[in-house]
């Protein structure tokens, strides 16, 4: 499955026009309870130290869905931010609004996307980033996500493209820190 997911990701990035991307070493297809290879932590640290991003957007400690690999990614990104983030850089954790949870989560229960206690919920007024994709931006996002056929085909069958657009239009992040210095 790893080769399939890699091909899908590359297609998705092509749709978005992303020309710079780095793959981490280690397995790319693990089950929901499996940890990622810890070598990834050092790789993320090296990338943050080299790139010195203004902002890092990642999963929160709950992994958004409760999937262990997502929680590992959060830990790695947070540790890299703390160790090598440039002064003034911001760290953001993915979250959902109460409105999203009320409207969308009941519709996706059958897909086991969210484990108990997830997704995290943050009131819209407390978000650090609150972006709602519309029009051409939403169309581009959907085209990019539809390239991930192995992960999204069931949702697309149930919701159709318009319903999927509602499910995926919000990008919500809570402020998780600012690098001092």
Language-model features: locations:
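Active-site beta-strand->loop->alpha-helix modules in alpha/beta enzyme cores, enriched
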Residues: 1-87, 163-165
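The feature marks non-catalytic terminal segments
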Residues: 86-181
